[in-house]
Amino acid sequence: PKIKEEIFFLPDTSYFFQNATIEDMADFYSAYYPRYDRKRMTKLLGKISLDSKRKISTFSKGMKRQAGLILGICAGTRYLFCDETFDGLDPVMRQAAKSLLAYEVANRTFTPIIASHNLRELEDTCDHVGLLHKGGVLLSKDVEEMKENMHKVQCVIPDARDEEALLAELQVLQYEKRLSLLTMVV
């Protein structure tokens, strides 16, 4: 279907064909994504010194991440679904990846959807965050609003009835109890 031309998925564990090079993967993606931009790919790879003719299997985890992100961006899709995008990248490459995504958002119709367990990592990249829990949307807010209105609270409440009353009274997003220590995100 036509809609698949608008979506690229970048999984947590990058998958590339056995013995494939970045060029091989670009050939593959070009067949499915009519707006695949090889010139842009060559330019981006040159900026980070990744050899498009080297076997991807010889790359480090971070290099594979970079290759996957560049392949995904150059597919020219409207949406890029990313799972743990910045995992495995050193701090310099992490910032470069964030800058690349920001550039794409600013210069074309492009929306990255980034799944991460590290909310702090997303606060300077995303303007909207959704929290998923047990298959549902627990929360959907602007990052700034969320930072202003969310708090982590730790306390000890000796009486279980007081604990139940407190939990019923607050909007608790996350709750954990270890021995007598109660930790909540409200």
Model-inferred region functions:
Residues 1-114, 119-133:
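ABC transporter nucleotide-binding domains
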